[in-house]
Amino acid sequence: MDRERFVDAARLEPHGGRGVLLAIASAISFGAAGPFSKAVLTSGELSPLRLAQFRITMAAVVMLGVVVARHLSGARPTHRWTRADAWLVIAYGSLGFVAVQICYFIAIDRLPVGVALLFEYMSVVLVAVYAAVLQHRPQPRAVWLGVTLAVAGVVVLTEPWSGFRLSVWGSVAGAGAALGCAAYFLIGERGTARLPVLELTAYGAGVGAIVLALVLPVWTFPFSALGHSARFAGQDTPVWILLSVVVLVGTVLAYLLGMSALAFLPSPSATVIATLEILVGAVVAWGVLGEHMTVAEIAGGVIILTGVVVVAERARLRTELPELDYVEARDLTPT
């Protein structure tokens, strides 16, 4: 029997429910911070690339500060790094932090937002296919059903046919966003098996901050914009307050919760649950910004929720392998 299947079983049982809750909390954190990012971008105080740089760099500062403080206090022994660990973190930071955000911002600049979102969330399919075909981890029918429902829900919710147009570079960027998002889950899944979640996320953000600093020098950042105001929920709100939510909730908390979920859930299941982000963003925008949800958005949200419920129920149930009948995960610990 395949070692990878043991890993999947161990992730699902007996803590699959915990993984589901962590993945849902991560999606809520990502989605809830969306309207705050939108307010900053709409105000014109920061460009999309500068916003990405600020959130990643400040998140790195916060998390690396915690890592250093914990090591100095002796609360956690220093991890013995290997060359493989270093390359994994470099890949995670470059793809999971930088590529997905930069490519998405380029995509929405050249494509309708619905089309760009559809591109990005095709990562749900990419992760499931990669796990099944290249990693030889056959996925249960419930996961494939969840993937199908999640993608269908995203299509209905984003209405990509509205104002439809295609751009070559926009499509390339959209594909890059999908690959970056898939890498976030696949590399994160491997990383959580090798490194503590906090260190993986903190050093990954650090790599992302360095990569962006090479392209966008920090000394050219428009720091004066932090003292300006942007319209949020009908009021003038300091940009630094909006960005604080984006950094602490939409980046630090969201990434840490997402990586923690991957310690208990296989990446294909986690990606399906992650599609809740777009629904949460729409609901928060409706509740806070007064943006009305259309019938299509509500219907798409229901479809996404159905897919999440299917996958969550699968994670709750004990793992069933083709060769064995109701195998206990504690008996599947890799040697």
Residue ranges and their predicted role:
Residues 2-9, 56, 159, 239-241, ...:
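C-terminal-most transmembrane helix of multi-pass membrane proteins
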Residues 29, 70-116, 120, 156, ...:
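Specific transmembrane alpha-helical segments of multi-pass solute transporters/efflux pumps
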Residues 50-61, 104-138, 177, 267-286:
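Specific alpha-helical transmembrane segments that line the substrate/conduction pathway
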